[in-house]
Amino acid sequence: QVLVMKDGKALYDRCFGYHTDANSEKVKPTDIYDLASLSKTTGTLLAIMKLYDKGRFNLTDKVSDYLPFLRKTNKENLTIRELLLHQSGLPSGLLFYQEAIDGKSYKGSLFKQSKDALHTVRLGVRTWGNPRFRFNKGMTSKEKNGDYTLQVCDSLWLNRSFREEIRKKIAEAPLKDKSYRYSDVGFILLQMLAEELSGKPMDEYLWQEFYQPMGLEHTAYLPLRYFDKKEVVPSAVDRFLRKTTLQGFVHD
């Protein structure tokens, strides 16, 4: 899709190609794409700004005042301002999914800097993964039922207890100095903060406060809750963790 606008008017608006190949959906103007890290500003930040405007918190407040699992940890004194500025000392990211993988289910290491017979999936510039692993017993299900309520892709659901694993991993993560360091972890905490203060899941709060009132008819968190799957363009083929094409679910 190519759109060129000037002074509020569309000068050029054309669609080309297909979602995956010539046998799939043609690209349409209303198709929905994964915004990836842009969701920090088009989602999480919007929610935080709205709650700030409503007087629900001050920027100098400690995050632990609202998220008790951070109390009595090295993150007890982190402020909301530091999270927003990426100056909290938090790591850039954490591999939460490792907590769901059975460490005894695969040979060798899970990651390696170069490709070999075991590490066949490229995950980064110098990172290759071993996809021959199993998840911990009781952690995943192929369908939603009972305690398995956290959907990761079409046929993978996590036990809701995994939220506690995420909180634990964040609480135990080391802190570095407070120079600028882009951090996904900081914005995960901001999402938790927004949901705690609003009393609503992030997708519902954003839909009600922003996307619906603004007439953004094809924008949403968790798009498959609001749109038909065929309206969403596939974003990645995950050969490592979920072993499927991702459509309507985040790729990282």
Residue spans for each PLM region:
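Extracellular/periplasmic catalytic domains that process cell-envelope and extracellular macromolecules
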Residues: 26-27, 73-77
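Active-site SXXK
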Residues: 8, 32-60, 187-195
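Short, glycine/proline-biased beta-turn/loop segments that scaffold the active-site neighborhood
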Residues: 59-73, 213-214
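Generic hydrophobic/packing signal
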Residues: 47-52, 67, 84-91
